[in-house]
Amino acid sequence: PGTKEEIIAYFKDFTKIVHKYGMIVSGDCNSELFHRLEATETDLSVFKDIGVDILRMDFSFNDERDATLINNKEGIKIEMSTSFIDVIETAIKNGAKPENISTCHNFYPERYTAPSLEAINDINNYWKAKNIPVAIFISSLVKGSHGPWPVSDGLPTIEEHRDMPIEIQ
């Protein structure tokens, strides 16, 4: 919660520190935040101002606006769920440049709900064949670590990784 200006200031302070250490900022965005920050598919300047390098979209427009968003003038890479196959394929047919797209698997906070390594590899191979990068979530064994809500079973993409040390995942 907070005003548009408070949200921008909060995240801008964070992204400055991240960039100072040479890291890339990937910001997760749902439709509510997108509209609250008054962003549009033709104007992502608010995210550029915040310092976002990759914008992970938790929603799509399901029309030609996805291609416009992906080809944004701000140069922000657009990340979509690996499950958005039809959305991404349609966006590319509508002129989206594949080099402006990345994908990311979801995380699974509840034990026994995450996909297997084999299932993840199948979808990774699909995107790899299209030269579109894929990201996953790794799980933390640190007690008291958290996610977007209280969780106690980690936030892995792959079920087999849930209880593995980070250096093995």
Language-model features, listed with the residues they occupy:
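Catalytic beta/alpha-barrel core
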Residues: C29, G51-D63, I76-D86, S102-P109
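Catalytic domains of carbohydrate-active enzymes, especially glycoside hydrolases
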Residues: P1, S45-L55
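Glycine-rich, proline-tolerant flexible connector loops at the mouths of alpha/beta enzymes
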Residues: P1-F14
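Catalytic alpha/beta core domains of metabolic enzymes, predominantly
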Residues: S83-I168
